[in-house]
Amino acid sequence: MNRPHQYFTIYDYRAAIKSLDNFIGEFVGSKFREEALYYKFLASYEIAINSVQSKKYQRLMDLKQLHNNIVRYYPETLFEEDLSKKIKTVEKEINTFAN
C-alpha cells in the first residue's frame, strides 16, 4: 500500500489509481482494501473535478459508481464523512450537465 500512497502524495493520480487497482486485484481479502478503495476514490475525484469539459461528465459518473461500490461493500466505512462531502460536490457537477 506504500507505492499507491506515494503516488497520491506527489499528485500522480493516474499512477496511484493503476497501482491501487493492482493492489485491490492481487489482495482481495486484505484488511487495507477499504483504504485502497478510498484512496482510489480520492485520486479519481481529483482527476474528475479538474477534467476538461469533454471528459468530465463520464469521469464524474464513474466516480459516482465507485462511491456506490465503497458504500455497498463498507456501509459503515471510516471515511463516510469525507465521502459524503465529496459525492455532494460530484452530484452538483453532474447536475450542471443536465441544464
Which residues does each PLM region occupy?
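Acidic, polar-rich low-complexity tracts and alpha-helical solenoid repeat scaffolds
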Residues: 1-99
